[in-house]
Amino acid sequence: MSFSTIVKDELCRIELHDECCMKSEILGVILIGNLFSNEKILRNTKVVTENAAFARRIYSIFRRIYGICPEVSIRRSSKLKKHVSYSLTLVPNQMINKILYDFGISAFTEDEYIPAASTLEKVCCRKSFLRAAFLSGGSISDPEKTYHLEISTHNIMSAEMIKDLLDDYNINTKIIKRKGSYVAYIKEGEQIVDFLNIIGAHGALMELENVRILKDMRNNVNRIVNCETANLEKTVNASIRQIENIKYIESTIGIDKLPENLVEIADVRVQFRDASLKELGEMLHPKLGKSGVNHRLRKLDEIAERIRKNNQR
């Protein structure tokens, strides 16, 4: 089961008790689902969905609010995966004008959908509209792979309406045109969490948050491992360089020609190739800190470099 299906199934279990919220969900279905269509004289309304729970929800709300029992037909795809789709049709003359009047919609053409400003005045109604918008045309990617939530609409006005509503919640929504549709989408994980909270998908929200936490932990572990690997590589390379310089000094002027403190550090460096600066300092008499050890080893590097330059003349 896809994550989109999980979210939609959860949303369909949310019970509505207020008529205003039920009407707001119907508005979401109308605008986002492109519910109305013109067929010459007859005016038909139809919504098609592959989600059985959403089909039942639409049927129930229309029956409770308008006393309409949509005609339901089921279609099974002949393709390999055999998808099942549910079509709900409101036949002509079944209070269609009443539905339009409630939403301030005066025409069937997509560019003239004008919902009444008061329809989404309440916070609960705005949430109901956004919930229905996602149920009608929304999808969300598997959070294990990427963060992406979108709602596909059939007209720019509907997409902009969604964007305006989400702007009020400080959710950054962008709109793109894709194959004749207008898609409002969200890309940031934290803002997708906020959207799921608004529409009431709290179970899916927690699942997404868990995934985000695990991904953050994995990323942090990877950063730490990469940092430690880089530091280890740096330490190994430094050790190799230091030992080469010590051997070069020994083969040219001899280590015993150096001050006693440099002879001592050269001796432990050669004996303990994998030791850190701190560990080398612990082996000296008296003990020396990391900065002191590093200073002496740099002195050996400088001496070796001077000898090389003199030999090249």
Swiss-Prot record:
Residues 276-309 bind DNA. InterPro entries: Homing_endonucl, Sporu_reg_WhiA_N_dom, Sporulation_regulator_WhiA, Sporulation_regulator_WhiA_C, WhiA_LAGLIDADG_dom. Keywords: Cell cycle, Cell division, DNA-binding. It holds the Pfam family LAGLIDADG_WhiA. Gene3D superfamilies: Homing endonucleases (3.10.28.10). GO terms for molecular function: DNA binding. One of its GO terms (biological process) is cell division. It comes from the Bacteria. NCBIfam families: DNA_bind_WhiA. Involved in cell division and chromosome segregation. Belongs to the WhiA family. This is Probable cell division protein WhiA. It comes from Ruminiclostridium cellulolyticum (strain ATCC 35319 / DSM 5812 / JCM 6584 / H10) (Clostridium cellulolyticum).
